[in-house]
Curated annotation (Swiss-Prot):
Gene3D superfamilies: Mur ligase, C-terminal domain, Mur-like, catalytic domain, NAD(P)-binding Rossmann-like Domain. Signal peptide: none annotated. It comes from Pelagibacter ubique (strain HTCC1062). The gene is murC. This is UDP-N-acetylmuramate--L-alanine ligase. Transmembrane segments: none annotated.
Amino acid sequence: MKIELAKTEIIHFVGIGGIGMSGLALIMKRMGFNVQGSDVLGNKNIERLKKDKIKITISHTKKNIAKATIVVISSAIKNNNPELIEAKLKQLPIYKRGEMLANIVSLTKNIVVTGSHGKTTTTSLLASIFSKTKLDPTIINGGVLNAIKNSAKLGKSDWCILEADESDGSFIHVPPTYSIVTNIDREHMDFYNSMKDLKELFIKFINKVPSFGKSFICIDDKNNKDLLSKLKMKNYYTYGTDNKSNFYIKNIKQEKEYSQYDLAINLPGKKNLTIRKIKLPLLGIHNIRNSTAAIAVAVTIGISQNIIKKGLKEFKGVQRRFNKIFTHRETNFYDDYAHHPTEIREVLNGVRAAYKNEEVICIFQPHRISRLKDLKKEFSLSFKKADVVILCPIYTAGEKIKLGFKYNNFAKDIVKNSKVRLFMVEDQYQLAKFIKNTIFGKKIVVGMGAGTISAWMRQLPELI
């Protein structure tokens, strides 16, 4: 994907260290744009960008945009950010990440993955299937793919596989040729006033798919299913464990290292087909659904069964999606990004289905006060497949609002509603001490959250 560009434009990314922003910045740099950026803290995403000779400043100050001609902001940037204020004073064009993403993929054949949960894994599975073909797509993902050790890759063809984030509504600007809607859940209510508003935006997005494209909608999800009658055209295929799905998942088998299933395909005007013994090196029915979405797209555009099965079987994974990080005294420790009740429940369901006899311990760090306030009851019900929960302090992500209830009472709600043993820790050192003194033998420990819990998990071997 190559575009001739005005070399005089300097594009500044405010909040360049985020996974979505860093991936977009990398693609634009490799396309030939003059890219720079800033963030308040350094991280691995920024280190990857520096290897591509992208200038990055660790601070937010108006001096950073002195030469910028275009500004791109992440959804995390507040109105009082000095760079955003200066950009407005200078009357520079200011784009949200989703708006800029839409601009750069406007001339490609786009497979756009949307939904509340499962976007990153689904995008990654699609990328793995495509990697076994002669097609060379551009990839823009919300997580780091182990196969390419990055969240983005500039391809040579006119295909683009991208994850579109619904958190600020900007995904509506992305032009889909094919779209996947994994599910719709109560999330980002600080932006959407209601579930009705969220659903209506998804309807608008699906209706943007052209006649020569297709949408793929998981009807295991009730909110997704509710959309079908409200779409303008029946230009979609359904998938899921519902036997009325066009891509019907059946004969599921879950082992400790992989999942296996058959997929019955029933498309209007076409001969029925079954792909048998699909092997996936991921746990959980949620990941079987994610892989089915990828298969549905691949089948529709004509990729062969053998290539599809090979792409899934040889999937290298994506960082922070149930990654095994170390083993200590026969206990396996995993890291996962789950930070919403639905995600926590699905991950634990998958772990329990594969590890029926092992004790499952979940280390949970809530992410954002607002999310915990909004979904307090749902969180308390989401740990039923665990045996033990270790509850960490809330990672506030800079929020300064009041919780509105005692944190100890939330812990009691988890014990009552999920029927687990629960322990609270104050920091990573107390966590390490607890693990050192109490956890050994054949157990599964999963750290969950979108804050610092991943770093805590990776530092545990040095502390225990």
